[in-house]
Swiss-Prot record:
It catalyses: tRNA(Lys) + L-lysine + ATP = L-lysyl-tRNA(Lys) + AMP + diphosphate. Homodimer. NCBIfam families: lysS_bact, PRK00484.1. The keyword Protein biosynthesis applies. Mg(2+) 1 binds at residues 420, 427. Coiled coil: none annotated. Keywords: Aminoacyl-tRNA synthetase, ATP-binding, Cytoplasm, Ligase, Magnesium, Metal-binding, Nucleotide-binding, Protein biosynthesis. The gene is lysS. Belongs to the class-II aminoacyl-tRNA synthetase family. HAMAP family: Lys_tRNA_synth_class2. This is Lysine--tRNA ligase. The keyword Cell membrane does not apply. One of its GO terms (biological process) is lysyl-tRNA aminoacylation.
């Protein structure tokens, strides 16, 4: 028998067993409905305690102290284990045991015996402590709140199918503590970032999710249709241009935490729908942003994890202190010490397209015919340097032709006052001094339109209203976007973005 045939046989047997268990549970529910006025789904039980709170408040008390207290609680949750008279009940804050002595079991009779793993119950009783020191509720009252018709995957050796974890996240969260913890961390990260920004006098705002003209980033948009207006609209790829309109309007510090949508491929680092925190501050430049980012990330790590140092794969990442800063040009030379062409490269050579194409091909970059010198430089960097940036690093010196919204450098107008922030070998943030020269922005938008006509699907559209906003005057401003999903990946030592997005995009099942 081949492995494939054997696996298919095992799967068929598991499916048959599961179907049998489902049928048995449905029969139990039918019996419950006959004897329950709520049709088997009562909604009058009220809990007054959480397992986690009880552990904190009473976990250190002795068995004798708890007996003297006779503290009665009402708990509710999902049955995760049933061992004779003991039940393990799980809810959002943790787990606690419930104990049904023989007298209680006699009273409950079939009601207790018919209980299955996965059922949701309510229990009332006094808190006690076992000989091993574990808290438990001495069951005096018990009520089945929801009958689980499907068995949990422990019956079938756990939820080991990675794709099924994402498709049935609800099951993953029930049985996988690591998954639950990752999303608790995510929630804390969001709260910590929000609180930090508010403490720095930033105002939280909401900008449109559907745009008439997509903008703010180089990406392919999702297209939809507004029936009432009979016009195409685009799910936003970035909120940038709307946020800068607010700065023009007089809100000097704004931020938004929300979703962006990009009609691109799936990978361990990319999901078409993802979360960004984007912010803008007037009378600041990109160097101020780097300082603020150092403070923000060290603060978030300390608040969420209790430390600025954490493991990531085989490395230990340090969020505290001052982060490395180097230009893209410097990084390419630094991480390619044995590449003669790169070591001989000068900043002036970057504008020699033939030379840049030659170098790009030598490091296995598949060159597109419409790429500019700046795009070639970025691709060489991405291929040879980016994966090596494990510790927090700001990469500066981005060419203007790949930075259509960034202010040109006063020292060399070929470059811009822009950085991207890397950690764990991936980009996590992008920031720059904003281009507030309306005429320069107009010219760059037109160059983007030409690039799109030449085959660059990710080039930006021309946004006339944004030019009008700039003509009213945008103060000197700096802005930045931080990828929440990738940041959470780092803080949870996770290597695929699907593990930190509750419901990631999935291909249809066959």
């Amino acid at each position: 028998m081949t492995d494939a045939v054997q696996n298919e046989t095992v799967q068929e047997a598991s499916a048959q067993e599961e179907n049998k268990l489902i049928a048995e549970r449905r029969a139990k529910l039918d019996q419950i409905r006959k004897s329950c006025k709520a049709n088997g789904h009562p909604n009058d039980f009220r809990r007054d305690s959480l397992a986690g709170d009880l552990q904190k408040e009473f976990g250190e008390k002795s068995k004798e102290e708890l007996e003297a207290l006779n503290h009665v609680v009402a708990i509710a949750g999902r049955v995760m284990a049933k061992r004779g008279p003991f039940l393990v009940i799980q809810e959002t804050s943790g787990r606690i045991q419930a104990y049904a002595d023989k007298d209680v079991q006699k009273v409950l009779k079939d009601k207790y015996q018919g209980l299955d793993i996965g059922d949701i119950i309510g229990v009332k009783g006094a808190l006690h402590k076992s000989g091993k020191g574990d808290l438990y509720v001495n069951m005096e009252e018990y009520e089945l709140l929801t009958k689980a018709l499907r068995p949990l995957p422990e019956k079938f050796h756990g939820l080991t199918d990675q794709e099924m974890r994402y498709r049935q996240r609800y099951v993953d969260l029930i049985v996988n503590e690591d998954s639950r913890n990752a999303f608790v961390v995510r929630s804390k990260v969001m709260s910590a970032i929000r609180n930090f920004m508010i403490s720095k006098q930033f105002m939280e705002v909401e900008t449109p999710m559907m745009h008439v003209i997509p903008g703010g980033a180089s990406a392919r948009p999702f297209i939809t249709h507004h029936n009432a207006l009979d016009m195409p609209m685009y799910l936003r790829i970035a909120p940038e241009l709307y946020l800068k309109r607010l700065v023009v309007g007089g809100f000097d510090r704004v931020f938004e935490i929300n979703r962006n949508f990009r009609n691109e491929g799936l990978s361990p680092r990319h999901n078409p729908e993802f979360t960004m925190m984007e912010f803008y501050m007037a009378y600041a430049d990109y160097k101020d942003l780097m300082d603020l980012t150092e403070e923000l990330l060290s603060s978030v790590a300390l608040e969420v994890l209790g430390s600025t140092s954490m493991p990531y794969g085989e490395h230990t990442v340090e969020f505290g202190g001052t982060y490395t800063r180097m230009s893209m040009f410097e990084a390419i030379k630094h991480y390619n010490p044995d590449h003669a062409q790169i070591q001989a490269l000068t900043e002036e050579d970057i504008q020699n397209r033939d030379l840049m194409v030659s170098i790009a091909k030598s490091v296995h970059v598949e060159v597109e015919p419409f790429w500019t010198c700046g795009q070639l430089l970025e691709e060489i960097f991405g291929e040879t340097a980016e994966p090596k940036l494990m510790q927090p690093t700001f990469i500066t010196g981005y060419p203007a032709d790949i930075s259509p919204l960034a202010r040109r450098s006063d020292d060399n107008p070929f470059f811009t006052d822009r950085f991207e922030f890397f950690i764990g070998g991936r980009e996590v943030a992008n920031g720059f001094s904003e281009l507030n020269d309306a005429e320069d922005q107009d010219a760059r938008f037109k160059a983007q339109v030409e690039a799109k006509e030449s085959g660059d699907d990710e080039a930006m559209f021309y946004d006339a209203d944004y030019i009008t906003a700039l003509e009213h005057g945008l103060p000197p401003t700096a802005g930045q976007g931080i990828g929440i999903d990738r940041l959470v990946m780092l803080l949870t030592n996770t290597h695929t973005i699907r593990d930190v997005i509750l419901f990631p995009a999935m291909r249809p099942q066959a």
